[in-house]
């Protein structure tokens, strides 16, 4: 399945209460599991820099990936940027010989 990376920058309101942030994470994760059962979550990272979180997941197609991102954004607590990712060994196949 294709791999997607979502970078999320939280709003200041989202980080005011750590308990609320933990609750929000559980709610979003449950929503994704319920509405996108075919998605395989690979990793979640808190990151330093202009973004607060990096999520890596596999989805069967870009429509499903877009649905995951729309679920994340629907809670109104962050801005996202989404990338597709390709394992290096697959990328090497497309390099000129």
Placement of each model-derived feature along the sequence:
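Short, well-ordered beta-strand segments in beta-rich or mixed alpha/beta enzyme
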Residues: 5-9, 45-68
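An amphipathic, aromatic/His-enriched active-site/gating alpha helix that lines ligand/cofactor pockets
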Residues: 59-89
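A short linear hydrophobic-aromatic micro-motif
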Residues: 38-44, 80-81
């Amino acid at each position: 399945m294709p791999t997607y990376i979502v970078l999320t920058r939280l709003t200041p309101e989202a980080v005011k209460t750590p308990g609320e942030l933990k609750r929000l994470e559980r709610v979003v994760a449950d929503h994704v599991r319920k509405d996108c059962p075919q998605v395989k979550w690979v990793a979640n990272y808190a990151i330093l820099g202009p973004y607060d979180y990096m999520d890596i997941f596999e989805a069967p197609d870009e429509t499903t990936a877009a649905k995951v991102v729309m679920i994340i954004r629907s809670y109104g607590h962050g801005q996202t940027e989404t990338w597709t990712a390709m394992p290096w060994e697959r990328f090497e196949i497309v390099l000129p010989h």
